[in-house]
Amino acid sequence: MITGSYLSIITLNINGLNAPTKRQRLDEWIQKQDPSICCLQETHLKTRDTYRLKVKGWKKVFHASRDQKKAGVAILISDKIDFKTKAVKRNKEGHYIMTKGSIQEEDITIINIYAPNIGALQYVRQMLTSMKGEINNNTIIVRDFNTPLTSININ
């Protein structure tokens, strides 16, 4: 995809970003990890509060949320890569965001999913089926599917 280089992606369920201390710690963590792309789940930010997702060196921030402090997903793309945005598709409930673009003239699609607590597998299956035409070999899907691996993980 990127000639002579690589693309690094980190993903994190942050369980809310309304506290200034938590936003500062996230900023420091992203700077330390130094990824190309950072995907966040459970931002808990209202639509009008997305400005709180600012991280130095990260001007491309895509966010999907609702007007309640729950759910919310974000895709942050570092300024160190030349990402050209072509399209963004947001879920109004804040459960997924899809960003289509290109890096060094190579198309890429990034989908970040935060599945609802109830009916997560069915939700993800429906969502991916509805996006079938959008998904190809250059699609990266990151997520918090909210599904236990075994019955022991339910509680």
Question: What is each PLM-predicted segment?
Answer:
Residues 1-155:
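A shared catalytic/ligand-binding motif for oxyanion handling
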